[in-house]
Amino acid sequence: MLNYVIKRLLGLIPTLFIVSVLVFLFVHMLPGDPARLIAGLEADAQVIELVRQQLGLDQPLYHQFWHYISNAVQGDFGLSMVSRRPVADEIASRFMPTLWLTITSMVWAVIFGMAAGIIAAVWRNRWPDRLSMTIAVSGISFPAFALGMLLIQVFSVELGWLPTVGADSWQHYILPSLTLGAAVAAVMARFTRASFVDVLSEDYMRTARAKGVSETWVVLKHGLRNAMIPVVTMMGLQFGFLLGGSIVVEKVFNWPGLGRLLVDSVEMRDYPVIQAEILLFSLEFILINLVVDVLYAAINPAIRYK
């Protein structure tokens, strides 16, 4: 297992290099001139050219790329074109709000999603199954931005129960986490149901029932453990989705996280911040997939990696 983990970690190097190249080319293909945006619409050509020189945008593209890669290897992603602060500091100040929002959303989504999926599988083709799957389909179909605005209108504007802006207290996490985790809970419910339906029809489940084991114990001990392997895969993918896909939710709730920082950076063509954030999201996805593979072996000892 240790050798497998080491090989996967070494595989990060070429993957992140390819991502770095693609991201660099992508951001430089975006329409718009960062120097003009930073200098202002009323700036003349001389001022804009001066800003371009200060930002290093007057240099050849290959020179900019080499400067970016050589510094990134050392952990230096440069300065933000807008704030003139180190990119690492910009990301660090926004990382924890996004991480806590993601964890909060994931916790409730997994608990409710798996519970709904198990109930739907145990009472298959009956009203609990139909009700759970109807709610799940609605959660998948409803756009996150529309759900966010609906929750704001009901619980903040009309009832005045919850705040909408900021991340200062636990109340600020309720509406964004509900919005962000709704689709994940729906996906988890459908995926858990499908996995449990397959497991419940296995021979060892019938054997456990024939031995007089209670249905609750059969489901929790024998069913849950064997149904968890595909569910863990989905959990890992959804966690990565939440980390990188919170852009819309953070924009709706004006959340001080990485998603809003990325949107603001794209609007201002802040190349260093865009490049660093996308690279960070890629690294998160790779590491999450590695953790999922390790959890496979923990859940099912029959799985071994070489």
Swiss-Prot record:
Membrane topology per record: Multi-pass membrane protein
InterPro entries: BPD_transp_1_N (IPR045621), MetI-like (IPR000515), MetI-like_sf (IPR035906)
One GO CC term on file: plasma membrane
Keyword Membrane set for record: yes
Membrane topology (Periplasmic): 30-102, 156-168, 250-277
GO process annotations (BP): transmembrane transport
Protein localization: Cell inner membrane
Keyword Membrane: yes
Keywords attached to this entry: Cell inner membrane, Cell membrane, Membrane, Transmembrane, Transmembrane helix, Transport
Description of how the protein assembles with itself and partners: The complex is composed of two ATP-binding proteins (GsiA), two transmembrane proteins (GsiC and GsiD) and a solute-binding protein (GsiB).
Name the record gives this protein: Glutathione transport system permease protein GsiC
